[in-house]
Amino acid sequence: MFAVENGLQGDPRLKAISDAIRVIPHFPKTGIMFQDITTLLLDPVAFKHVVDIFVDRYKHMNISLVAGVEARGFIFGPPIALAIGAKFVPLRKPGKLPGRVISEEYELEYGRDCLEMSVEAVKSEERALIIDDLVATGGTLSASINLLERAGAEVVECACVVGLPKFKGQCKLKGKPLYVLVEPNQFDELTL
């Protein structure tokens, strides 16, 4: 579900967020329109809007953990977790976490990847929110859901700042809700 479908249509914070995200054509390869959140992070007002919208949504959902996907989920996850009184759990690329981990491989558009999580990070029946900067195919979010559920957590929702408009990966999310603030085609519409 996009934020504009959830009562935020016309909210000036969405325009500020959209305006703060730079689109870089043909990066990292031809045909890709890279959604660069670096410029969003340089705008403290827009960055705060992102955190505030997510906090408003999740503060009464009894979320006990926020799982952030490496690397940009690490940017948004901790301030949201602190604001709603939850712990933050990093989901990392292989070999980055000390101690015992569980792993989940997943398909990318052109290949495979893997996420890992500390086995001590999650307790059975905790309520989890997964946060990342962008959803394209749903592969990374799906792997994140699998990791958390294998550890006994209940995934309440997945949340991303940007959702690609042709996203078909919701079917990969095992029926879990997806909440997205903006989509790339909104950038042009909102700046008219």
UniProtKB/Swiss-Prot annotation:
Gene3D superfamilies: 3.40.50.2020
Record carries keyword Cytoplasm: yes
Compartment(s) of residence: Cytoplasm
GO cellular component, one term: plasma membrane
Coiled coil ranges: none
Biological process, per Gene Ontology: adenine salvage; AMP salvage; purine ribonucleoside salvage
PROSITE patterns: PUR_PYR_PR_TRANSFER
Record's protein name: Adenine phosphoribosyltransferase 2
Species annotation: Arabidopsis thaliana (Mouse-ear cress)
